[in-house]
């Protein structure tokens, strides 16, 4: 067999500007294979070096990067350390765009890093006033919109645990997931758009509340721009009313392995199984993938086609930690044209498209 031709290869000048090249040089490696071998032979040294390279900030440093490295089931990472996931995703500031939202109906909006930081502070204070504390669960039944990211970061900032589903999930599918984790607060939208149609979400929300009695507050995002009636939904608050304007941004420091996200298996063999992802592991793994493997930085505009019900949403949002502008798209990828995402890529000057 003949080797397939190389489609593209970076020149030496471009290669030397990448984060991977700089990281290898810092660790005195000239060959990627040697770097890889070191990363699996000296695992603790590799992850310590990555923390330094990516400026991971521990409020309490670890006693040791890795304890009992030979056994995956008993290994303990960065024991004794504390940090904040939200603090790392919100460490950038200024008027540069943090989030750009695009909808299939042509809607477009932007949030700067400063605006994002303030919005997270306001919602976090609303959560505190609602009695949400460390270890409580907060859930989102939301379109792929900026409010979903704000609610997640606000949740993480106080040490609570986030879980989300896309609004195209049916009532039973959402109850099977959220019902297992006993959430205290539900963030939802009045509806969403898909393939040119506006779909009501509040009927499903009523069904969720009838089946999940742990939910104490329901916060509604007015996503569709249409008037809605929700007086019959218990303890309902409008997004703007729930946010406590002018709050200070604070970050609760938590253990490295403190739960950050609850995600789910597909549910094809029974009720979906809960999968917990920790604060430190999620942050480090995403930084490794973004910074080393994709060379993402503050000059990038990062997009991945996803919904809030897929793990790639969580992966996309972590691009904020590298200072990238993340692009959200909600709706059908083929509405009005089968090239709608490519047109968006051109208009938004995307540098990473997934």
Predicted regions and their residues:
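Conserved pre-ATP/AMP-binding loop-to-beta segment of ANL
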Residues: 95-97, 218-220, 231-264, 271, ...
